[in-house]
Structures are given as structure tokens and as C-alpha cells.
Amino acid sequence: MTSWRRAVPAVALSALAVATTAGCDNGWWTYHRDPVRSGVDSQLAVAGRVSAAWTTNLDGAVYAQPLVVGGTLVAATENDSLYGLDPGTGAVRWRTHVASPVSRSVLPCGNIDPLGITGTPAYDPTSKLVFAVAETQLGGKVTHLLAGVDPASGQQRILRPVDPPGSDPTASQQRGALTVTAGRVYVPYGGLAGDCGAYRGTVVASSTTGTGPLISYTVPTAREGGIWTPPGPVVDRSGNLLVQVGNSAATAGAWDGGDSVLKLSPDLRLLDSFAPASWAWDNAVDADLGSTAPSLTANGYLLAVGKSSTAYTLRAGHLGGIGGQVTSSQLCAAYGGTAVAGNTVYVPCTDGLRAVSVDSAGAPHVLWHANTAVTGSPVVGGGRVWSLNPSGALYGLDPRTGAVTQQLPMNQTSRFASPTLFSDSVLVPTLTGISAFRGA
């Protein structure tokens, strides 16, 4: 085990200069802004302190991170609605009710009631549609519908079922963010809270035209192995998809694909994988890697953190198979999405956000450890790191030190909520709608 070495905090500042925009102009088109899930907006214009600007109540809780496309803020609710808002004022421009959500009483377990659109939508600049998945019932059966909506008008242009094959749709939850790349929209699936029923972690892909057959990859386990974490699939420099997988059925014998990092081709063939040597034990005690997504650094490494408090550094070009990590070290238990600025990864640890720098040899260095109340999935912009506490607080942190520079009260959020950065504003999804905070 490699020890975590404390480095000079100024490294964090230099890392902030390397922001990944991935061609999404000055909007926010997907979870954490770009397909690599950097969570960095180098164009955010925040000077001085921020203050509450507006709050708009919607028809349900907002678990998904809001998007900003062409000057319209797009929010998705657990009432299966998509909204277009004015990001400057919060005024509602349009509302599209995709379907009727599923009552918790219909489901075998779970902790969202009702269950509608949970995963963060994604915008496709080619079709000019925002894609979202709505959970609903058709003919008395639970199903998942992929909707494609014009972000300017709210007009729905695509609607098709995208249930994971070989799994019970009633036990399958679409929590992870959608990913758009290579002319397809990718939809990850895990299970409901409680891991009940016959589900297996799956990624389903549809053409962005909404036509043609679906393709899919399913974790080769008897059950579980969820691909559930909010960031969804990450796209690497070669256009392949990276996912982290939760605990699966096997606790002895042959590895069955769980507790892992998987690399999938655009047509969803398995290309490469990593699993800790402790995968069987991790599966047995629910201490797997499925609670976050892969964090790609600028120098060619991948940092994978999960529930067990062990962080693994992998080579992005060769994941290493079972036990093939570059380093493994004790860091923290982490849930949600990281932010990545250059070679610095901001990790949403359950005992407080950490900034970790990965050097040219793959060795990790803890730069700072924030206040224990700062646990939300971070984003970076305007000279600050932004994070939420679900009890109702927005934090702005100094990226050099992790010190809290500002704490603002707000409505409660879901556990994995993450803010969106746009223009001079921080836009926050809450259990009642959207709240905006603006720089002075």
C-alpha cells in the first residue's frame, strides 16, 4: 500500500488552469459539463461573494444536475417533467410532461417517491435534442422511456422504451447521468435503494435519431453489479466509455464483473477492466467501487475511489486487470461525482471533500481536506470549488487550501446533488425546484 503524501497546496492552483471544455461552448450540456465529467468551467465570471438571486419551484424534486443549452436552463423532475427556464430570472419558458412517475408503493424497494426522471439528461449538438429517461408505467408495467426534447421550445421529438434486457424493469433504476457520444445516447442502470429484485448493471444505447435497434452491455453476474453512480459513463480520449461497477453476486470463485472499472467501446464491447484483488470480500460486505465514476487526469492516469476508503490509481490506457493498479492507498469513502482540473481530483468524501493531485509516476498527494460538512459532488469555476450539503447549504471553497470562503443557506437537496455553473451564476437542484446564486 502506498502512503498518501501531503504536497504543496499551490499545486491545486496550477491544476485549475487546465480545464476540459470538450466543445460545449459556454453552456453545461451534460453531467459535470463535459463527457470526461471534469466539472470545470473556466469561463464562470464570479467576482467577490455570491448571494441568492432567485428560486423557482417546479412540479417535483430535482435529483438531476441542471443543463444550460443555448441560453435555456433545462431541469428534470421526479414528476417526469422537463422544464426550460430563463437562467437569469428563473422564469419558466416551457414545461414538457413526458409521462406519469411511478409510486414507491409499486416498487419492491427504493427511496425516491415518486420515481420519475432521476439521471441527469444530456444534450446532443447534432440532433439538437436534450435526452432524458423517464420511469413510468405502461399497461400496468414499469418501463423506462427515452425522451428527446428540443431545448428551445420543449417540443418532444423522440420517445422510445430503453429497458435493460435481461433485468426486471421494476427493480432497475436509471440514476446515472446519460452520455452522448458517437451518435448514440448511453443509458446506465443499477438497482433501487435496498438492492432488491432481479437486476443487473447494464448500459443501453440508442441512436440519437431514436431509430434502429438498441445495443447494450450487461455485467456478467447473476445479479446486482449496478452501474448506478450519478456521473454515469465517462468518455476517454479515444471515445471509449468508462464505468465503475458496484458489488455483484460472486463472493468466491471466478470474478463476475462487479466491484470494477470497465472500459467499453462505442458499440458496448468490453475492451479492458480492473478489479481490486479484494473484489470477493468487497462484494460480500458492500465495499465496492460503484459509488463514484472514473476520474481521468491530464497525465494519463485514472483515479478510482469507492465505498471501501481505498483509492486506486490506474493507467488510463491499460486498466490492469485484477489487482493491476499502479497504486492503492487509504483515502476515504466517496459517493457521487468528482471534479478534475488537470491532474487534481476533487473527491466527495463522506468526511469532507479532499483535493488529490496525481503526479507523473501515478503517485497521489493529498493537497487538502475540507470541513466535514462539505460532502457534495463538487464543481470548479470562478476561482472556487463549489459543493453542497443536502441539509441545505452551498459552500464556496478556496481551491488552494480548501478553506470555506462562503456558506449560503438554501433549500434541501438530494444526497448526490451537484450545482451547475453558468455565466455569473451557481444553479442548484433542490427537492422543490431550482435555486440560483449570483456573483456580486
Where are these regions (language model features)?
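Aromatic-lined, polymer-binding surfaces characteristic
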Residues: 175
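Periplasmic/luminal catalytic loop of GT-C fold multi-pass membrane glycosyltransferases
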Residues: 118
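Extracytoplasmic/lumenal domain signature
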Residues: 26, 30-33, 37-60, 68-73, ...
